[in-house]
Amino acid sequence: MKNVLSLLILFSFITTTAEVKNQFATLPDIYSVKISPDGKSIGILRKIDGERMLSILDIQTNEVIFNHEFVRGDEINSFYWASEDRLIFELLRAGRDTTRYFATGQVYSTDIDGKKQIMLAGYNAKREAVRTGQGSAKRPAQVANMMPYDKEHIVVQFYDSSEFFELWKMNIYNGRMSKITTAPVKQANFIFNNQGEVTGAVGMTLQNEMVYYIYKENLPIEYDPLDC
């Protein structure tokens, strides 16, 4: 709590959102600083008392809206603003020596005040997010695209042993999801446009050659390779 109060003291001297971001970024143990889409709130992910905590503050009033942290070993790896009042987290966990961390493949969503929480993906996915159609949310995943013009959905990339990654569109409030596509090549990197729509993929062939694929929705063969 003492460390949180020290944040507020510094915060009271800052007048603009640009200054807010720059000032907090110079503090020790800061992992990430992001301002909300409406510019009214700021999220500061930092280590406090040995734990990674995300503090959401009101820029105008200097008040802490909520401190987000996890128990039982999980910690916040990264966070995203889905809207001015909704957050997305990717989680990690410390190794046995507590000096190394590894991603758990869990994707979590909550309001900025800690309400309406749901584990969207990973081994702790909630029941309503577990199965829709032919896909299970109880798989390792990460955020692939935040879909900036859609405040209720994100694109999640799921992993499995086949290494042909899958993209799913997921509702950040109830976990319902619909499949977008499967990668045309192992360990592909997907490409998106400004609207958050997948437009292609990049990957390596068995002959160790880089191949670019153009995504064509609703066709029997969804990808066309480009000669490079």
What feature does the model see in each segment?
Residues 4-14:
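Sec-dependent N-terminal signal peptides
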Residues 18-228:
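Beta-propeller folds
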